[in-house]
């Protein structure tokens, strides 16, 4: 017969634990537990943000990146090193879907500066994306490319991936009628 989904999840988590990929896990048994876990996630980011506001770190560069799970720790060390060399007072908060490598990687800058990053926010973002690329990640994960990131597409995607995206877009929408005026290529 079929194995219930909870048993499948337990088996996967047990294997991850045995391989030292995780140290703990929780499976929600009902909607109240699920809501409780979500509130912890949301409260943690909000709490950290309030602490940063006390130091006037209120400008935020938000990034939606993905990485191979096994690279997250090394990526974060490299990113923190780059960020502290860039502007030592910057701080990061990252959270998200660690199990599949999708991260909301937010960098907070000084609220006294026009953009919070000494006018270097795009340069900082490019440096971060270079580190993402080093670890075979993507500068855009679950939220897609969109208008804000379209200029990063050719720079931060390898040529094969970029070409495949163009081919797929042209095959699915040869007349350019889906999302007109927003074509990325």
Language-model segments: residues:
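Gly/Ser/Thr-rich beta-alpha loop segments that engage phosphate groups in nucleotides
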Residues: 98-103, 139, 146-148, 183
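Short amphipathic alpha-helical segments
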Residues: 119, 123-127, 140, 148, ...
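Alpha-helix capping/hinge segments and adjacent helical runs
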Residues: 133-145, 170, 174-178
């Amino acid at each position: 017969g079929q194995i219930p989904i909870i048993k499948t999840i337990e088996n996967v988590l047990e294997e991850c634990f045995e391989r030292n990929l995780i140290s703990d896990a929780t499976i929600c048994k009902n909607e109240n537990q699920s809501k409780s876990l979500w509130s912890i996630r949301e409260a943690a980011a909000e709490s950290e943000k309030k602490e940063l506001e006390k130091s006037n770190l209120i400008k935020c560069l938000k990034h939606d990146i993905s990485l191979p799970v096994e690279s997250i720790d090394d990526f974060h060390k490299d990113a923190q090193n780059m960020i502290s060399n860039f502007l030592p007072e910057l701080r990061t908060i990252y959270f998200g879907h660690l199990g599949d490598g999708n991260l909301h990687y937010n960098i907070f800058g000084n609220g006294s500066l026009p953009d919070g990053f000494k006018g270097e926010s795009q340069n900082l973002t490019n440096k971060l994306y270079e580190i993402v690329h080093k670890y075979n990640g993507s500068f855009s994960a679950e939220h897609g490319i969109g208008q804000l990131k379209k200029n990063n597409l050719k720079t931060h995607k390898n040529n094969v991936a970029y070409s495949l995206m163009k081919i797929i877009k042209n095959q699915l929408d040869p007349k350019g009628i889906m999302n007109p005026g927003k074509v990325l290529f």
